[in-house]
Regions:
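Hydrophobic faces of well-ordered beta-strands that scaffold small-molecule active sites
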Residues: 3-7, 35-39, 68-71, 98-102, ...
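Acidic (Asp/Glu)-rich catalytic clusters
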Residues: 26-30, 56-65, 87-98, 181-182, ...
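Alpha-helix-loop-beta-strand connector modules within alpha/beta enzyme cores
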Residues: 46-70, 124-131, 135, 211, ...
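An alpha-helical appendage that flanks or caps ligand/catalytic pockets
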Residues: 30, 119-158, 194-285, 295-301, ...
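Active-site mouth loops of central-metabolism enzymes
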Residues: 5-19, 73-81, 161-172, 232, ...
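Internal, glycine-rich beta/alpha segment that forms the wall or movable "lid"
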Residues: 76-183, 213-216
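N-terminal beta1-alpha1-beta2 module of alpha/beta enzyme domains
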Residues: 1-62, 163-165, 292
Length: 311
């Protein structure tokens, strides 16, 4: 079983401390129980949030072994050429520690703010992933797509990891999960997916993986499955933990989102351990813990008190 912790991108009080940011990564790595740290992407919105790629790069400079990822980059809003270059660069300077989560973002993303037409976003997503992989693996790329065209171009350096960093797909609808398994190297359940819904997504992913002649797992050639978990622990008052995480989610999204609130895990230590075990039983081989308040304190409590109960 593997465990990960979120990169603390949110600072609801508007105050950001670079020193605290560095200390967080150093402390997370020192615990030795977190394999990786993950950002998420929300460029526009009501809550102050650091950009994922830059936060990952800073984290790489503060650590030596912690793997670094984003779940997910909304790749329909990115140039695949620039994203391929940026992630290859970070993989080089971090010594091969990059994990890349990708997703289409859905039809309600602010495409107009990026000067991108909203129609054909799924085709744009699929084509973009194909182009990223080509730039990462081929010495010279000729690509004649609907959205991007390249003729005999090279992108160097390639990523440090060979053939390339693992591409995780993030999505929830059955068709999206099937598409993601075909395109990517791992499935990452969203923090907004309740455990029962995640279990159904895992079943879909496993079926497609089996049809492709693969196995689920973290071994060579295998297809891993993970899940983000929004979490709040209160040693003495589980209802207070629930209220606080619901308030934090409302600040992050700008309004109450009952579906996401129902997917979050909150309560006493014992209640949280039981709920996380259910996520593991549903098929998660890695759990990404995402506290939204008192983040350094939660990171330490999860490492020293919660994870030992799950081992």
């Amino acid at each position: 079983m593997r465990f990960a912790i979120s990169i603390p991108q949110f600072f609801g009080d508007g105050e950001f401390s670079p020193a605290d940011f560095r200390a967080y990564f150093e402390r997370a790595e020192a615990f030795g129980v977190y394999e990786s740290a993950w950002a998420q992407e929300m460029t526009l919105g009501p809550s102050p949030q650091l950009a994922p790629l830059e936060a990952m790069t800073y984290a790489a400079a503060c650590t030596s072994s912690l793997r670094l990822g984003c779940t997910v980059f909304v790749t329909t809003l990115h140039s695949p050429v620039q994203l391929a270059k940026d992630l290859a660069t970070l993989d080089q300077v971090s010594g091969g520690r990059v994990e890349a989560g990708v997703g289409s973002g859905g039809p309600r993303r602010p495409f107009a703010a990026y000067g991108i037409p909203a129609d054909r976003y799924l085709a744009r997503f699929t084509e973009g992933i194909r182009l990223v992989k080509a730039l990462w693996t081929e010495p010279s790329v000729t690509f004649d797509g609907e959205f991007w065209q390249l003729k005999g171009v090279a992108m160097e350096p390639k990523p440090y990891q060979k053939p390339h960093p693992r591409l995780w797909f993030g999505g929830s609808a059955e068709a999206a999960v099937r598409r993601g398994v075909r395109l990517c190297d791992g499935f990452f359940g969203a923090g907004s997916s309740p455990t029962a819904a995640f279990a159904a997504q895992v079943a879909t992913a496993r079926a497609v993986v089996a049809d492709r002649g693969q196995r689920v797992g973290f071994g060579p050639g295998e297809f891993p499955i993970a899940k983000r978990v929004y979490i709040a622990i209160d040693p003495s008052d589980g209802s207070r933990a629930r209220q606080r995480i619901n308030d934090a989610l409302a600040r992050m999204y700008g309004h109450r989102v009952p579906a996401i609130e129902s997917a979050a895990i909150a309560g006493t230590l014992g209640e949280c351990a039981e709920a996380v075990r259910a996520v593991i039983d549903a098929g998660a081989e890695m759990v990404l813990f995402t506290p939204l308040f008192e983040v350094p304190e939660h990171m330490e409590q999860i490492a020293t008190e919660l994870i030992p109960q799950l081992a």
